[in-house]
């Protein structure tokens, strides 16, 4: 079972992404462990406290204190999380800034079911 994290300071955005993932689960007959975080700090704190290794993280970039990019940089420094697939879900027009942390993809908010399905297909294929 894959561990998926969703990190966005807006609850509605987190719930929408989780809904897309649940629809994928139903369609494909797979199950994921899904975790939600309201900030980069909350995500990093949870990674330090618990022994969770995420296979996929959806990160919003525009969050209050730590941005998604700053959060991703810290995650990439961790040996256990260095292979985690990161997808930025953002309203930012300039996606070049994200390339320094080698994201799997950058998705414009709010994202679509088709786009999330393709990302999940990709991650599952990598893990097979």
Which residues make up each language-model segment?
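Alpha4 helix (beta4-alpha4-beta5 surface) of REC/receiver domains from two-component response regulators
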Residues: 70, 83, 91-108, 113-118
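Conserved acidic segment of CheY-like receiver
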Residues: 2-21
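Short amphipathic alpha-helix used as the core "switch/output" element in two-component signaling
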Residues: 45, 69-82
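The C-terminal output helix
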Residues: 121-128
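Acidic catalytic/metal-coordinating carboxylates
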Residues: 39, 67-70
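Acidic, metal-coordinating helix/loop segments flanking the phosphotransfer/catalytic sites
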Residues: 36-56
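Active-site residues of response regulator receiver
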Residues: 8, 59-61
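His-Asp phosphorelay/catalytic-motif detector in bacterial-type signaling
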Residues: 52-55, 79-85
């Amino acid at each position: 079972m894959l561990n998926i994290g969703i990190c966005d300071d807006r609850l509605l955005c987190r719930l929408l992404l989780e809904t897309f993932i649940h629809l994928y689960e139903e369609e494909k007959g797979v199950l994921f462990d899904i975790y939600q975080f309201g900030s980069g700090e909350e995500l990093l704190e949870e990674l330090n406290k618990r022994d969770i290794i995420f296979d996929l993280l959806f990160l919003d970039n525009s969050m209050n204190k730590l941005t998604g990019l700053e959060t991703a940089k810290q995650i990439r420094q961790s040996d256990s999380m260095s292979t985690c697939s990161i997808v930025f879900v953002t309203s930012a027009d300039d996606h070049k800034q994200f390339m320094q942390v080698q994201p799997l993809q950058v998705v414009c908010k709010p994202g679509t079911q088709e786009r999330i399905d393709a990302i999940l297909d990709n991650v599952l294929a990598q893990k097979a």
